[in-house]
Regions:
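Alpha-helical transmembrane segments of integral membrane proteins
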Residues: 5-9, 40, 82-86
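Non-transmembrane, membrane-proximal soluble domains of secreted or membrane proteins
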Residues: 20-37, 61-294
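Alpha-helical transmembrane spans of integral membrane proteins, capturing the lipid-embedded, hydrophobic core
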Residues: 8-11, 46, 50, 87, ...
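Structural signal for membrane-spanning alpha-helices in multi-pass inner-membrane proteins
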Residues: 14, 56, 97-101
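Alpha-helical transmembrane segments
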Residues: 37-65
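N-terminal secretory/membrane targeting signals
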Residues: 1-21
């Protein structure tokens, strides 16, 4: 019996162990609010699930073949009190859940700015095959598979894809948002304290999907300024030629930085007028950039 239960115990421990860097271990206000929403929704649903399980066990025990005290009434097909309980409680649960989800969904709108004393930092995100490109338009630097942000500072993300549809997710900081070619989605996050938080693609996007990961490094504001100065003094510029090489499909790409980038580079990627996977399609169609919600 103990040996049979061992795999179940080990799988449960492994599952709970993964929560140390997931949605149940938030490191920002958005992720904390989402965890509370998840816990509240689960608790409300357990109000129905637990009584149903207990009632099933109780009915199975009471109406067992050996219980001669159990009364069988095959002629009865309606009982008002039972009907009231069966329909009213689920209806109330649905209404309560709807209210909780409605309020939470609007409060956690990914486009909504996060109130904070510090001015927000803008970061443009581009999904490539199979890596993430982060452009800092105000600092005019860029990084691949490494997101460095100052702790306690709201981060305003603009996201797009230079290839297939993808999904951007940092579980410990907050919401998952889709990226699409020729479009822009928006996301606002904040890291409460310095730390390193794993991020990844949450949507299958091809052969190198499993390696499409990055590290979000939250550092003190002074360290962020020092990092920007270091990036500006090393590496190469992110121009059309460098981007064309970067945009080629590749797996397990190590972190890299670019010391300079044109201020309109992100817009050119959206419009598909820069060399890359969407260049031919953009040259043929020249679709205007569309901006949608996160």
């Amino acid at each position: 019996m103990q040996r049979a239960a061992l795999p179940v115990v080990l799988s449960g421990a492994a599952t709970l162990g993964g929560c140390s860097q997931g949605v149940l271990d938030p490191r920002g206000p958005i992720a904390a609010a989402e965890r509370l929403l998840l816990i509240n929704s689960t608790a409300i649903m357990l109000v129905v699930v637990i009584p149903v399980i207990l009632a099933t066990l109780a009915f199975a025990w009471w109406y067992r073949a050996a219980n001669t005290r159990a009364r069988r009434s095959p002629a009865e097909d309606y009982e008002g009190r039972i009907e009231f309980v069966v329909w009213s409680i689920p209806a109330l649960i649905v209404i309560l859940l709807s209210g909780v989800i409605w309020i939470g969904s609007h409060e956690l709108d990914p486009r909504a700015p996060i109130p904070a004393k510090a001015d927000p930092l803008r970061v443009d995100v581009v999904a490539l095959d199979w890596k993430w490109l982060f452009i800092y338009p105000d600092q005019r630097v860029a990084a691949v598979n490494e997101l460095v942000i100052p702790a306690g500072t709201p981060i305003q993300f603009r996201l797009t894809s230079a290839t297939v549809m993808n999904s951007f997710f940092i579980p410990q900081l907050g919401s998952q948002v889709y990226t699409m070619g020729g479009m822009t989605t928006h996301l606002n996050l904040l890291a409460d304290a310095p730390g390193e938080y794993p991020g990844f693609s949450a949507m299958f996007s091809g052969d190198g999907f499993s390696d499409m990961r990055f590290t979000a490094k939250s550092v003190p504001p002074g360290d962020f300024a020092a990092w920007v100065r270091q990036v500006r003094s090393t590496g190469s510029a992110l121009d059309d030629a460098a981007y064309a090489a970067l945009a080629k499909p590749s797996k397990a790409v190590p972190p890299a930085t670019y010391r300079s980038v044109a201020p309109d580079f992100f817009e050119r990627i959206i419009d598909q007028t820069v060399a890359g996977p969407g260049k031919a399609r953009g040259a043929a169609l020249h679709p205007p950039a569309r901006h949608i919600g996160g």
